[in-house]
Amino acid sequence: MKLLVGTLRLWEVGRQVAFSSLTPGQECSGLRKTFWAAMRAVRTRADHQKLGHCVTMGRIMRPDDANVAGNVHGGTILKMIEEAGAIISTRHCNSQNGERCVAALARVERTDFLSPMCIGEVAHVSAEITYTSKHSVEVQVHVMSENILTGTKKLTNKATLWYVPLSLKNVDKVLEVPPIVYLRQEQEEEGRKRYEAQKLERMETKWRNGDIVQPVLNPEPNTVSYSQSSLIHLVGPSDCTLHGFVHGGVTMKLMDEVAGIVAARHCKTNIVTASVDAINFHDKIRKGCVITISGRMTFTSNKSMEIEVLVDADPVVDNSQKRYRAASAFFTYVSLNQEGKPMPVPQLVPETEDEKKRFEEGKGRYLQMKAKRQGHTEPQP
């Protein structure tokens, strides 16, 4: 009976899609073609979900999800994005018989905060596997906010995440990923290009971010030293997966908090996360480690601030391992006036040669992203 009901529902959806796309002058042959094309589209979506390539999760935003301005904390959104990605990638990597594994977050591509999310709204997070290599999974995530009083929905975030499957028997062993079926050959080729690009950038970033932020006494306003900040956090069980390693989303939220402190100290106004450049996870963080999350201003444009955030882990209960770099990223913040509109920020004053070099590198990233946005903007009539 359930199979019959499901078949009838599938037929009805296909019929409605087909008839909604017809024009009055179409003939029966056109009707048949449109109907069966719609049926194939519906079945493709259903099969895609059945195979486990999509997952959707949602929850209402509570007061404890808010930042000081009253909107949903950017770190909370990043954490939800990572949770959805971890679910779908771990499920996929265990979809075939073999050694069991857990998917570990390796990298988050640039994430833009397109629209603020408010307390009381429902966050809908949808994740889809879009590419698999031999040892990694690409997951694309979309975040929608819904006002349940008015029914209004809007897109707030888009992100791309990369995961690697680690064996439950030996977490240092990376397992092979079951391949996915692509609808078009072009999809696989485009995914392979994205994979090679992120792999190269991850290797370059790991060696570039080698220095540690050092505190300076009595710094001058608007300098790097004036606003640089750090948080020290002891990793506990609530921060970790069932296997004793820190959730990537926990690390990202702490990174966002430090970046927000740096931005607020620099401009002394309300600030919000505008975007996050690629977050690279260089190494795993175990339960019991003490992590130091350090942030420093690297560049300012007229209305935006770029903050570099570094995460260093110290295995205090393991004398055999030294302090190491666990993650790094660049966050972009904007300053808001009382009406919630972007306003100019104080210009950063780099003092040392390293600070001047980082400023020029940040300027290059800013101009590159600005040109990319302008290139995607459609000309107005």
Swiss-Prot record:
Residues modified to N6-acetyllysine: 169, 199, 284
Pathway terms, separated by semicolons: Lipid metabolism; fatty acid metabolism
Biased composition (Basic and acidic residues): 354-364
Catalytic activity: hexadecanoyl-CoA + H2O = hexadecanoate + CoA + H(+); dodecanoyl-CoA + H2O = dodecanoate + CoA + H(+); tetradecanoyl-CoA + H2O = tetradecanoate + CoA + H(+); decanoyl-CoA + H2O = decanoate + CoA + H(+)
EC category: hydrolase
Region span, Disordered: 342-381
Any matching Pfam family: 4HBT
Biological process per Gene Ontology, one example term: fatty acid catabolic process
Recorded GO CC terms: cytoplasm; cytosol; mitochondrial matrix; neuron projection; neuronal cell body
InterPro entries reported in the protein's UniProt record: Cytosol_ACT, HOTDOG_ACOT, HotDog_dom_sf, Thioestr_dom
EC number annotated for this UniProt entry: 3.1.2.2
Molecular functions per Gene Ontology: carboxylic ester hydrolase activity; identical protein binding; long-chain fatty acyl-CoA hydrolase activity
Keywords, ordered alphabetically: Acetylation, Cytoplasm, Fatty acid metabolism, Hydrolase, Lipid metabolism, Repeat, Serine esterase
Effect of residue 67 to A: Dramatic reduction in catalytic activity
Induction of its expression: Up-Regulated in activated macrophages.
Tissues in which the protein is found: Widely expressed with highest levels in brain. High levels also found in thymus, large intestine and testis. Negligible in muscle and adipose tissue. In the central and peripheral nervous systems, displays a predominantly neuronal localization with highest expression in cell bodies and neurites.
Active-site residues, as the UniProt record annotates them: 67, 256
Listed CDD domains: BFIT_BACH
Domain of life: Eukaryota
Domain HotDog ACOT-type as annotated: residue spans: 51-169, 225-339
Domain notes: Both HotDog ACOT-type hydrolase domains are required for efficient activity.
Subunit structure: Homohexamer.
Function: Catalyzes the hydrolysis of acyl-CoAs into free fatty acids and coenzyme A (CoASH), regulating their respective intracellular levels. Preferentially hydrolyzes palmitoyl-CoA, but has a broad specificity acting on other fatty acyl-CoAs with chain-lengths of C8-C18. May play an important physiological function in brain.
Name of the protein this chain belongs to: Cytosolic acyl coenzyme A thioester hydrolase
Organism annotation: Mus musculus (Mouse)
